[in-house]
């Protein structure tokens, strides 16, 4: 199987979650072995999407350096990962990726518009060779060897609308688009009011998030899935794991995970070469994992 990029340059404009201002997003093709490059048009700086460039995981995944950063990359990165794109340049004219509708589906549509082009280089993958786990109190994230990569995620909130939810997702492009990409980010009204008092989340609205008060969902249209909350947590994980730089072929299991735990998992996995193998997807290996990229 060959590496991929997008076939043509595409762009869109959306609102930034934190500033509440319009942001131009441009996606452009790159050559083989370039990886995923994030670029600040307004500052003229670029950085690679990889674990060592993550500088904050408090409310979103943020990559950057001393010269600048790009925040809230996880939904777009989930779409890039879900589509199996190996090489792409992502440019914005501000310090965050536009939130769009709070899910990844707008980015999937943009990638559909761009098309996929295969390059003259073998596709690299990361095979999980032994279990790696990050635990903090009752929360954990784990990756383990698997011939049938899947995400098994459980969340538990002391709230009547959410409660405990678990979702098992077998990874493939088609399943990602159908079952994960449309799941929106969610937040509590009391937290939004606190953030906006600090001039954060100024772009948040019912058009780009599921809002919850003490007892109800505030969005008049309701949920897209009965368990949309846990599906969105999987979306976030797909995006966070994309910073490994190649598709992760292994199981991912989480209880009450977070961007921070996902980042720590990528660091822990790559800290010991016995944990993983970087391989070219061909021959028997391709036959074994073909459906992941279907």
From Swiss-Prot:
Main enzyme class: hydrolase
Gene Ontology MF annotations: metal ion binding; UDP-3-O-acyl-N-acetylglucosamine deacetylase activity
Keyword Metal-binding included in the entry's annotation: yes
Organism: Campylobacter concisus (strain 13826)
Catalytic activity: a UDP-3-O-[(3R)-3-hydroxyacyl]-N-acetyl-alpha-D-glucosamine + H2O = a UDP-3-O-[(3R)-3-hydroxyacyl]-alpha-D-glucosamine + acetate
Keyword terms: Hydrolase, Lipid A biosynthesis, Lipid biosynthesis, Lipid metabolism, Metal-binding, Zinc
Cited SUPFAM superfamilies: Ribosomal protein S5 domain 2-like (SSF54211)
Active site: 259
Family: Belongs to the LpxC family.
GO cellular component, one term: membrane
Protein name: UDP-3-O-acyl-N-acetylglucosamine deacetylase
HAMAP family tied to this protein: LpxC
Binding site residues for Zn(2+): 75, 232, 236
Cofactor list: Zn(2+)
Biological processes per GO annotation: lipid A biosynthetic process
Gene of this entry: lpxC
Function noted in UniProt: Catalyzes the hydrolysis of UDP-3-O-myristoyl-N-acetylglucosamine to form UDP-3-O-myristoylglucosamine and acetate, the committed step in lipid A biosynthesis.
EC number(s) reported in the record: 3.5.1.108
InterPro entries reported for this sequence: Ribosomal_Su5_D2-typ_SF, UDP-acyl_GlcNac_deAcase, UDP-acyl_GlcNac_deAcase_C, UDP-acyl_N-AcGlcN_deAcase_N
Pathway(s) of this molecule: Glycolipid biosynthesis; lipid IV(A) biosynthesis; lipid IV(A) from (3R)-3-hydroxytetradecanoyl-[acyl-carrier-protein] and UDP-N-acetyl-alpha-D-glucosamine: step 2/6
């Amino acid at each position: 199987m060959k590496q991929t990029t997008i076939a043509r340059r595409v762009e869109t404009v959306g609102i930034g979650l934190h500033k509440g201002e319009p942001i131009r997003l441009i996606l452009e093709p790159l050559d083989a072995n370039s990886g995923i490059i994030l670029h600040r048009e307004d500052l003229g700086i670029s950085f690679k999407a990889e674990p060592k460039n993550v500088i904050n995981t408090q409310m979103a995944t943020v990559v950057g350096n001393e010269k600048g950063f790009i925040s809230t990359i996880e939904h777009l990165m989930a779409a890039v990962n879900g589509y199996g794109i190996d090489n792409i340049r992502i440019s914005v004219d501000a310090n965050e990726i536009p939130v769009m509708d709070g899910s990844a589906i707008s980015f999937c549509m943009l990638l559909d518009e761009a098309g996929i082009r295969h390059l003259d280089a073998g596709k690299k993958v990361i095979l999980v060779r032994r279990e790696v786990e990050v635990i903090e109190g009752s929360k954990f994230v784990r990756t383990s060897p698997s011939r049938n990569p899947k995400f098994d995620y459980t969340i538990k909130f002391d709230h009547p609308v959410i409660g405990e939810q678990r979702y098992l997702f077998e990874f493939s492009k088609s399943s990602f688009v159908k079952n994960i990409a449309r799941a929106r980010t969610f937040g509590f009204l009391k937290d939004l009011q606190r953030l906006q008092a600090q001039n954060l989340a100024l772009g948040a609205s019912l058009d780009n998030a599921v809002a919850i008060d003490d007892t109800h969902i505030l969005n008049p249209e309701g949920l897209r899935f009965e368990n949309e909350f846990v599906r969105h947590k999987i979306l976030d994980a797909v995006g966070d794991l994309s910073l490994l730089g190649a598709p992760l072929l292994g199981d991912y299991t989480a209880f009450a995970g977070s961007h921070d735990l996902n980042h720590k998992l990528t660091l822990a996995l790559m800290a010991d070469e016995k944990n993983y193998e970087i391989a070219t997807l061909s021959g028997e290996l391709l036959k074994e994992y073909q459906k992941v990229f279907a």
